Amino acid sequence: MRLTVVGCAGSFPGPDSAASCYLVEADDASGRTWRVVLDLGSGALGVLQRHVDPAEVDLIGLSHLHPDHMADLCGLYVFLKYHPRGGRPRRVVVHGPFGTASRIADAYGLEPGESMGDHLTVHTWQPGHPVAVGPLTLTPVAVEHPVPAYGVRVEGPAEDDPSRRVVLAYTGDTDACAGLDELAAGADVLLAEAAFVEGRDDAVRGIHLTGRRAGEAAAGGAVGRLVLTHLPAWNDAADAVTEAREVYAGPIDVAAPGMVVAL
């Protein structure tokens, strides 16, 4: 299983990155590559096409319905509906919080009675209920954010030994909470947002992690590797790493577009 960072800018596209989007791929025993996209935020669809044909994505998992995590589903709908390649209608499966289908339709501006169903098959996450995608298993975990939000644990075959199972835990957007602890527990890689900064953002809780709180989740969950992401353009990534390093002794990286993590 491997993770490719498509976009990692926090809250809006930055000068060097699209908003949140992460491609997870794994090969099954026959050699077929299965592809899951975690979030498809503002500006991400264009960058995603550097890595994969969007019509070949097996599932898109949305952490929540803020635009920096789902806005480019409107563009994906256009890609699937109007691409001149012909043949049967292209359809991509989407899992997200309750109301995902109506939110996408509203954002696109569908008329009453129109549907995106020929091209986007939308399902609602059920917390704790795994979703199988080839050799991958996705388990949503409810986390703390101002809107309904989920982290996602992705379990799949290790790159160096497919008989061994590994776990990528993606926080989406969250503050410290019991769901975050559940999400991180025993993960090989914790892909954790760190949009806030200790001292600067202390008065605002229930929205985002700091580097320190991401590090605390990694330490508490005995995580193998921490990858910090979702940093807005005005943050200094070095500050997030310094905060996390104060409480977590394992490897720490900062996500960057094109970064590949083999699990």
Name each model-derived stretch.
Residues 1-170, 175, 180-182, 241-263:
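Binuclear metal-dependent hydrolase catalytic cores
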Residues 176-261:
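Cap/insert and terminal regions of metallo-dependent hydrolase folds
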